[in-house]
Amino acid sequence: MKSKKYIPIAKLLSISLSLTLLLSSCTFGDNFDVDFSSLPTDSTWFKVTSQRTSTLDELPADCYIEGVPAAEYGQKIEQSPMWRTSSTSAASVMQEILDFSNRRTVIELSGTYWSVDEEWNDVQLSGKVVLPADGKAERIILVSHYTIGSNAEAPSRCFPIEAMLAKMGYVMIFPDYLGYGVTADRVHPYLVMDLTAINVLDMYLAVRPFLEAAGVEVAHDEILLMGYSQGGANTMAVQHLIEAAYYDEIKIRRVFAGGGPYDVLATYDHFVTRDTADYPIAVPLVMQGMIIGNNLDLNMEQLMQPYVYENIDYWVNSKQFTTAQVNKAIGTKITHNILSEKGMDRTSEEVSELYKAMTTNSILSYSWEPQAPVYLFHSMDDEVVTFANASRARVKWTNANIQYNFGHYGGHIQGYLRFVSSVKTLLEQDREIK
């Protein structure tokens, strides 16, 4: 992948200082009367397209888990056998999320920013910023979201559960990723780590000067990174990008990564060798992502069962359906019923090319070890992202400053709720230390 010529942060900040003079009459106070969409901005900054204020007395109706309103999801997963392996209940976790949300009013800003696509062409992407309505924050948290199916679940279109942390005094930044939000008509390059890491970091680079010019006060420059599932792996890729290319400009306070496919090849090969995919949509998602994101000259029609290949545009690329709905449409967890005979043949030339791309896009294949402190969470009961990812990370990153939290926390989504709850606790402890 070619090297991108970024505008230095120092230049962005000098632009922001000049525009701050124009914005000096805009104050937050107690009235929360700043219209962010009307503020003058630089073309390289985040551009607000919609704004709303939320009191968060309860989980918003557009706060989803697998396409189901989060407020209802606790009741749904209480019935799951996988949940009963957890040491806590769905109801208690959901209530805890509600409890720590009842602190401040927040402002949600959906908007666009510039980044690059898999061909290295400029592309306008979208995302959401959630901040305390008084305009005062402790730090910025850059969040990489988990795997979604429908565009309604893209952060710019909904209220991510992690956004509740804004009420603790954090600015939350949520990129949609290429293929969602304003680019929903494009194929998402699933698990193409270097590209998605750039897309995520570009939003931070666009939001930071915008917030400064708007008068948002962030007490500390060091940022936090956070993500679960696909977002967990991508969060580690963002950490790598910052520590490799932005170490003088961006300082990381801490990284929170949970349930991530840090070894994409091992995750996918797990489906093939066991001939079981508990999360069926992952099979076509990974294959399509590797082909599109790495410009591989491979024909998916030869590698998938006809009924999957013929429906992938409708089921997946239309962005109309949640992952749960697509899993139901696929109708099987048997991998050889999803992949063709050639697709199941790990010795074939085509699968070999796929596996090379998966290795390239596995964060554990990088010649790198995290420098900033990391909190790495994984449920040992995870049926979607095999626990082998976390155990391999522990073996690989032996000298890194990592706090591991491995336990029987239920399935993948149950682990997600536990992860968010544990991050909230760690953030509270961090504030007490200061």
Where are these regions (language model features)?
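C-terminal motif of bacterial Sec signal peptides marking the signal peptidase cleavage site
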Residues: 23-25
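Catalytic-loop region of hydrolases
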Residues: 30-125, 131-134
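Accessory cap/linker subdomain of secreted extracellular hydrolases
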Residues: 49-52, 258-367
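Short, surface-exposed "cap/lid" segments of acyl-processing enzymes
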Residues: 119-126, 130-165
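Alpha/beta-hydrolase active-site loop
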Residues: 190-213
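Primarily recognizes the serine-hydrolase "nucleophile elbow" in alpha/beta-hydrolase
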Residues: 205-215, 219-278
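C-terminal catalytic histidine-bearing segment of alpha/beta-hydrolase fold enzymes
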Residues: 350, 355-361, 381-434
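Short beta-strand/loop motif that positions the catalytic acidic residue
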Residues: 370, 375-382
